Amino acid sequence: GFSLEGVVAEYTAMRPAVQRRWQAAPGTIDEGITDIVRFDEAIDRVLSDSIAWYLSRVAHGRDLFLGVLGHDLRTPLGAIAMSAQLLLRDESLPERSTKPVLRIFNSATRMQKMINDLLDFTRTRLGGSLPTHRLPAQLGPLFRHTVEELAALHPDARIDYACEGDLSGNWDVGRLEQMMSNLIGNAIQHGDRAQPVSVMARGAEDTVVITVHNHGAPIPVELIGQMFDPLTQGALQHRQSRGSDSGLGLGLYISQEIARMHGGDIDAQSDESTGTTFMVTLPRA
């Protein structure tokens, strides 16, 4: 029933205790040194084996947890979303039923996104990494498709999109689409709905720079550096207080992980006069 820290602490305490007993025992110095060296080697070997066993159990638990989330939760949600989508396409659906069915579809879609975010969070926090598959691709059509999907999902929001320069590179297009969906969705959720969300992708010599900007109440200065940490309670409370659709608050963290796995990063700026801007810098290679 030991934790990893407890195992290391026990072996750490054992080593000096045994060495002190050897020092007090009769015998030659050479014999004592030889025994101590052998003892240290044995302790190091047992400690290494114990850590390896512990990490294998952690990996097993992680894989089991991800399997439950990935199958047992996503499967029924997928069935709900698909059924709602089929009903929405049915021309015989009464008009009074359209709004409730659309609400079911949107809620199921939002839950699927939360589960995907939780899966990614669990992978990264339990020692894993996000699975990636990078290929040569153009980001312009991908981002335009993402903007169109979010505009359809949020008909009361306006999204302005523009791109310039070369947006080609080696990208995991699925992950970058996920990142853009998170950032734009965050801007829609926390921004002023009376003003548009602005999305800009610009190709530079060695990088592609993406900005997502929204007007509205600024992020407090003391929280700017914490917005990408899902375990910072203050940042979570701030995000959750801004609307009922805040979800798990993992979107920004996962977006930063996606940018970093491409060798880039995300910065945030926010003030009363200009609003909030998230800027993603991605190297092409």
Regions found by a protein language model. Give the residues of each.
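Short conserved segment of the HATPase_c
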Residues: 219-231, 236
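Short helix-loop "hinge" at the ATP-lid/N-box region of the Bergerat-fold HATPase_c
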Residues: 187-188
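Long, amphipathic alpha-helical coupling/dimerization segments that relay conformational signals between
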Residues: 1-66
